[in-house]
A protein has these predicted regions:
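Two-component/phosphorelay signaling modules centered on CheY-like receiver
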Residues: 14-32
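Alpha4 helix (beta4-alpha4-beta5 surface) of REC/receiver domains from two-component response regulators
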Residues: 21, 65, 88-103, 116
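Helix N-cap/capping motif at the beta->alpha junctions
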Residues: 33-42, 63
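Short amphipathic alpha-helix used as the core "switch/output" element in two-component signaling
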Residues: 42, 64-77
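Active-site beta3 strand of CheY-like receiver
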Residues: 47-53
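Receiver (REC) domain active-site loop signature in two-component systems and cognate sites
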Residues: 58
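CheY-like receiver
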Residues: 123-152
Length: 152
């Protein structure tokens, strides 16, 4: 990855966002903050983070929705999701990995563990390859059909 790594910190508790952002100071990363799932989804499209640090327990648009949204458009190697959560039971952790999460950190957060995970995933991120939307596929097919009809 050539440009500065972009990290999106997502939690519904402001103090947790600030704590995580403070732990990342000193790393060569650009940080954006989201106070919930809806804002996170908005920033996935506009900010296009390389790494998302995501709390699991959020109201309204929850973390599962964010994970599904991200994985519908980005591969694990293109946009890493690191869950940071109080939920430390095996079923939750397994569910997260099955949904495409890259790493899982249990709260309370240990700075060395967080920094290590971010650094590891920062090194492994590849540039995203845009996935074709259904509209683009339809336009491509129509153009291909027109060329066949008109002998182009």
């Amino acid at each position: 990855m050539n440009s500065k790594c972009k990290v999106l910190v997502v939690d519904d508790i402001h103090e947790n966002i600030e704590l995580v952002a403070d732990m990342l100071k000193g790393l060569d990363v650009e940080i954006q903050k989201a106070d919930g799932g809806a804002k996170a989804i908005e920033l996935v499209d506009s900010f296009q983070p390389n790494i998302i640090l995501l709390d699991l327990m959020m109201p309204q648009v929850n973390s599962w929705d964010v994970i599904k949204y991200v994985r519908a458009s980005y591969d694990k190697s293109e946009m890493a999701i690191i869950v940071v959560s109080l939920l430390n039971n095996k079923d939750n952790i397994d569910d997260c990995y099955e949904m495409g999460v890259n790493d899982y950190i249990c709260k309370p957060i240990i700075k060395a563990q967080l920094v290590s995970s971010v650094e590891t995933h920062k090194e492994n991120i590849v540039e995203p390859t845009p996935k074709a939307s259904p509209t683009m596929v339809a336009l491509h097919n129509k153009n291909h059909d027109n060329k066949a009809i008109f002998g182009m």
